[in-house]
Regions:
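A structural signal for conserved, well-ordered secondary-structure elements
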Residues: 1-531
Length: 531
C-alpha cells in the first residue's frame, strides 16, 4: 500500500500537478547483511527460548506442563500463521514482540496450573480441581491480557514503523494467548484426564506454606525504591551538569544523523577519537561528533548534527578511503530532522499518559475500588522511574523502542498486580468483621507468590536468550525489559498491596463494603462452588 502511494505521489510530482519542493525529514539506510544476521539470530533465540521454556514447564508442572508445551507450540504456529495471512511486516521489534509474547503466553498457563494445585491441595478431586482452577483463573487472565492490549493499542497509535510492528505482534500474541490458555489447554487437559491420567501426583499440589509478613517490610521497600529513583535523578543531573544530556537520547528524540561503518578491523576508542573523528569533521565541516562502539565487533556509529546528502557522501568517501570497511557491508546512515524528533517526544509523553489513564479506568471498573486503581498506577509510575534510572546509569540509547519498552513493562507489571488484587478481592468476599486485614493481605501475597516467581522466570528465559543472541539494537531493547520484569515483580509483591493497605484497605469498613458488593453478585462456577 505504501509503495503504491509513493508511486502515485511521484507521478503527480513528475507531471507538475503539485507545485512543491520535497525536504528530507527522515531517512534510513540499513545493510542487507545486518538485517539478515539480525533476523536469523532472533529466530534462533526464539527457538532456543521456546525449548527452554517447555522444559521448565514440564519439570515444574508435570502433566499441566506438558499441556502448556503443546499449547505453546500451537500458540507460536497460530501467531506466525496470522502474521503470514495478514501480510504483517516483520521488523526486528516485531520479532521481539513475538518472542516476548511467547514468554507472556505462559503467564496464563501458570495462573491456571497454580490454581489447580491449590484446589488439589485443598482436598478437591483432580476433575473438580481442573474445572475450578480454570474458572477461578479466567478473570485474572482476561484482566492481565486486556491491560497489555491497552499498551499495544497506544503503541500502535503513537508509534513509528518499527514500534507499530512490535505493537501489532504483541497484540496478536495477546489475543491468541487468551484462546490457547482458556480453550486449547482446557480441551487437552480434559482429554488427558479422560484417557486415564487421573492421579493427583501427575498434577502436583501446593504444600502448606507459612504466611509471609510482607507488609512488615513496606517501609524498607519504599525507602529502597526511593533511594534508587533518587540516585537516577542525581545521575541525570550530574550528566546535565557535565554538559551531556541527562539521558542518552538517540536521534529520534533529538534529531541529527548517525553514520555507521563496519570496518575490516577493530579500532580502540582512542584510535577512533584521535584518527577517524577528525576525518569526519574535516569532510563534513562540523565540530561535534560522538562515537559509539558496538561491543565485540568492528562496527562503529558516529552521531552528528543534521547532515545533507552531500555531507553524508563526503564522510563516507573520506573515511572509507583511509579506513576500509568489511567486505559485503555498506555504510549505514540514519537521519531525523528536529521536527520529527519533537513529534516523537510529544508522542512518547502522550502514549505513557494515555496508557496509564486507560489502565486506571479499566482497573477501577473491574475492581470497583479506586484504591486498587490508584495503588496499581502508583506502582506503574514506580516501575517506569526505576527503569528510567537504569537508562541513566547504563547510558542505554533512548529512542523509539524506549516507548515500546516502557509500555511493555507497564502492561506486564500490571498483570502481577492484578493477580494479587484479584486474590485480595476474592478473600474479602468471604471475610467478616473479625477478619484481620493485615493477615488477609499477607495471605493473598503469599498464595500468589509462586505465580509471580514462575511467570517472571518464564518471561526472563525468553528475554535473556534474546539478549545473549540478539544484535545490538535488540540488546538495547531487551536489557531494560529484563530490568523492568524484575522491578515489576518486586513492586507487585512488595509495594502495590502495601499501598492499597495504607490508603484505607486496612480499615474494617472495607470488609463490609466488599461484602455488600459480593452479596449483590456472586460468582458461581461449573463445579457448583461460589466465591
Amino acid at each position: 500500500m505504501y509503495k503504491r502511494q509513493a508511486d502515485n505521489l511521484a507521478t503527480y510530482i513528475r507531471v507538475g500537478s503539485i507545485p512543491l519542493t520535497l525536504e528530507e525529514v527522515s531517512s534510513n539506510i540499513v545493510g542487507a547483511q545486518l538485517g539478515h544476521a539480525a533476523i536469523k539470530s532472533s529466530l534462533v533465540a526464539a527457538a532456543i527460548g521456546l525449548a527452554l521454556l517447555c522444559l521448565f514447564m514440564i519439570v515444574m508442572f508435570r502433566i499441566p506442563g506438558l499441556v502448556a508445551t503443546l499449547s505453546l507450540i500451537i500458540y507460536t504456529s497460530l501467531v506466525l500463521f496470522l502474521v503470514s495471512v495478514y501480510d504483517l511486516t516483520l521488523t526486528l521489534p516485531g520479532i521481539a514482540g513475538i518472542i516476548l509474547g511467547i514468554g507472556m503466553a505462559v503467564d496464563g498457563n501458570v495462573i491456571i496450573y497454580t490454581r489447580i494445585r491449590e484446589e488439589i491441595g485443598a482436598g478437591k478431586s483432580v476433575e473438580s480441581a481442573i474445572l475450578s482452577g480454570y474458572n477461578k483463573a479466567t478473570s485474572s487472565i482476561v484482566d492481565g491480557n486486556v491491560t497489555t492490549l491497552i499498551a499495544a493499542l497506544v503503541l500502535y497509535i503513537f508509534g513509528t514503523g518499527p514500534v507499530k510492528g512490535f505493537a501489532t505482534t504483541l497484540a496478536v500474541g495477546n489475543i491468541v494467548s487468551i484462546f490457547t490458555s482458556l480453550v486449547i489447554t482446557k480441551v487437552i487437559m480434559k482429554l488427558l484426564y479422560n484417557f486415564g491420567i487421573r492421579d493427583a501426583k501427575w498434577y502436583g499440589k501446593n504444600v502448606y506454606r507459612k504466611t509471609l509478613d510482607v507488609l512488615s517490610i513496606k517501609k524498607w521497600a519504599a525507602i529502597g525504591s526511593a533511594v534508587v529513583i533518587a540516585a537516577g535523578i542525581i545521575t541525570m543531573a550530574v550528566q546535565a551538569g557535565l554538559g551531556n544530556r541527562a539521558l542518552n537520547f538517540s536521534l529520534e528524540f533529538v534529531g541529527g544523523s548517525t553514520t555507521t561503518f563496519t570496518f575490516d578491523k577493530e579500532y580502540t576508542a582512542e584510535e577512533i577519537e584521535d584518527n577517524i573523528i577528525p576525518v569526519i569533521r574535516d569532510a563534513a565541516g562540523i565540530t561535534e561528533v560522538q562515537q559509539q562502539k558496538v561491543a565485540d565487533s568492528t562496527q562503529v556509529s558516529f552521531k552528528t548534527s543534521d547532515l545533507s546528502l552531500e555531507q553524508r557522501e563526503a564522510i563516507e568517501n573520506a573515511v572509507t578511503a583511509k579506513y576500509p570497511i568489511k567486505d559485503g557491508t555498506i555504510v549505514e546512515t540514519d537521519t531525523i530532522s528536529s521536527s520529527v524528533s519533537a513529534t516523537v517526544k510529544r508522542d512518547a509523553i502522550l502514549s505513557v499518559i494515555l496508557a496509564t489513564i486507560c489502565m486506571l479506568i479499566y482497573i477501577f471498573v473491574r475492581f470497583r475500588d479506586i484504591r486498587f486503581a490508584l495503588a496499581a498506577v502508583l506502582a506503574l509510575l514506580h516501575d517506569v522511574l526505576v527503569v528510567i534510572a537504569f537508562y541513566a546509569f547504563a547510558r542505554i540509547p533512548v529512542g523509539t523502542t524506549f516507548i515500546a519498552c516502557m509500555l511493555t513493562i507497564v502492561g506486564y507489571s500490571i498483570n502481577g498486580t492484578i493477580i494479587i488484587f484479584d486474590r485480595i478481592r476474592e478473600q474479602l468476599k468471604t471475610a467478616n468483621s473479625k477478619t484481620n486485614i493485615t493477615e488477609l493481605v499477607n495471605s493473598s501475597i503469599t498464595s500468589t507468590m509462586s505465580r509471580t516467581v514462575y511467570t517472571s522466570i518464564t518471561t526472563l528465559i525468553m528475554l535473556i536468550v534474546l539478549f545473549i543472541m540478539g544484535v545490538t539494537s535488540v540488546k538495547e531493547f531487551t536489557l531494560p525489559l529484563i530490568v523492568g520484569i524484575v522491578v515489576g515483580a518486586y513492586s507487585s509483591v512488595c509495594l502495590t498491596s502495601a499501598m492499597w493497605y495504607v490508603m484505607g484497605g486496612k480499615k474494617r469498613g472495607v470488609v463490609e463494603e466488599n461484602n455488600k458488593k459480593a452479596a449483590s453478585k456472586k460468582e458461581v462456577f461449573e463445579d457448583g462452588s461460589q466465591v
